[in-house]
């Protein structure tokens, strides 16, 4: 994972991405910022929409994102966090409680869990794949595998669908 000058994680993403994928990435970054800096949802959404999404920041061009998708993920995770966290905790192994995960990984899992629970119009495979790709942009170790396993377990619990990982 790379770090920006403001402490916000910056991913190593390829330049080709769809607007929803970019919105997912931006939502993860915004959730991270809210977690570590205590920024409120209205403030962080306004900041991203005014100064980041589709803009150039410190010499880095942010890609265009679907602003409605971005807002829905951020607001949805904030509104549903008290329901999402216990579900994620159940999907983690016993030796990896949610509190032990770093803020970026928590943001990825919360956003993915929210989409699985709320966006029934989006195929499970798309949601899991998108958030695994986001994890790969931030991590080079086993974290993307963890994201895949946890979201797959959650997909089974929430949607009755699974891509191969058995629920705990």
Swiss-Prot record:
The gene is nusB. It comes from the Bacteria. Belongs to the NusB family. SUPFAM superfamilies: NusB-like. One of its GO terms (biological process) is DNA-templated transcription termination. Transmembrane segments: none annotated. This is Transcription antitermination protein NusB. It comes from Brucella anthropi (strain ATCC 49188 / DSM 6882 / CCUG 24695 / JCM 21032 / LMG 3331 / NBRC 15819 / NCTC 12168 / Alc 37). InterPro entries: NusB-like_sf, NusB_fam, NusB_RsmB_TIM44. GO terms for molecular function: RNA binding. GO terms for cellular component: cytosol. The keyword RNA-binding applies. Keywords: RNA-binding, Transcription, Transcription antitermination, Transcription regulation. Pfam families: NusB. Involved in transcription antitermination. Required for transcription of ribosomal RNA (rRNA) genes. Binds specifically to the boxA antiterminator sequence of the ribosomal RNA (rrn) operons. PANTHER family: ANTITERMINATION NUSB DOMAIN-CONTAINING PROTEIN, N UTILIZATION SUBSTANCE PROTEIN B-RELATED.
């Amino acid at each position: 994972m790379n770090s920006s000058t403001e402490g916000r994680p910056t991913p190593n993403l390829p330049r080709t991405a769809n607007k929803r994928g970019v919105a997912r990435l931006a939502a993860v970054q915004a959730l991270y910022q809210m977690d570590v800096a205590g920024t409120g949802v209205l403030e962080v959404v306004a900041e991203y929409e005014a100064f980041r999404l589709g803009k150039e920041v410190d010499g880095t061009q942010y890609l265009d994102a679907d602003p409605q998708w971005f807002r829905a993920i951020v607001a949805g995770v904030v509104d549903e966090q008290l329901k999402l966290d216990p579900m994620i905790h159940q999907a983690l192994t016993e030796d990896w409680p949610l509190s032990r995960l770093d803020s970026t990984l928590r943001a990825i899992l919360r956003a993915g869990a929210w989409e699985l629970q709320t966006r029934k119009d989006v195929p499970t495979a798309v949601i899991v794949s998108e958030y695994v790709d986001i994890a790969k942009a931030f991590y080079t170790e086993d974290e993307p595998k963890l994201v895949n396993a946890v979201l797959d377990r959650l997909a089974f619990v929430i949607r009755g669908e699974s891509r191969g990982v058995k629920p705990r």
